[in-house]
Amino acid sequence: MEISIELRELQPFLNERGQLKNWPAKKKRKVLALWYLAGQLEMRKVYSEAEINTLLDEWTVFHDPATLRRELFNHFLLNLTADGRQYWRAEEIPLLEAFLTKYL
């Protein structure tokens, strides 16, 4: 699989298993990390808070699911019910270039 030039910037933050080793400090890399994590969520699957936390913990080494959930939601990559009990991936995730343009 060929990695886009933009996504290569995230490479130093990934371990050999593809997990995020730490949360990037720079905004562009944070946005790349969010886009990457959103891509790990299944389409049309509804997750409980515990399930989404477990999944985010599986894709990160630093284990901060609350921050990641909030950031994914704030960037319209994750939806949740009003009571915060159920989460699901946004129906359409924009192409990486469009996503970067929107948030940078």
Where are these regions (language model features)?
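A short, conserved structural fragment
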Residues: F73-G84
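Short alpha-helical segments that sit at the start of domains
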Residues: L7-M43
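Amphipathic alpha-helical segments within well-ordered protein domains
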Residues: W35-A38, N53-D57
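Short helix-capping/hinge SLiMs at alpha-helix to coil transitions
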Residues: L41-K45, V61-F62
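Short amphipathic alpha-helical interaction segments
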Residues: W59-E71
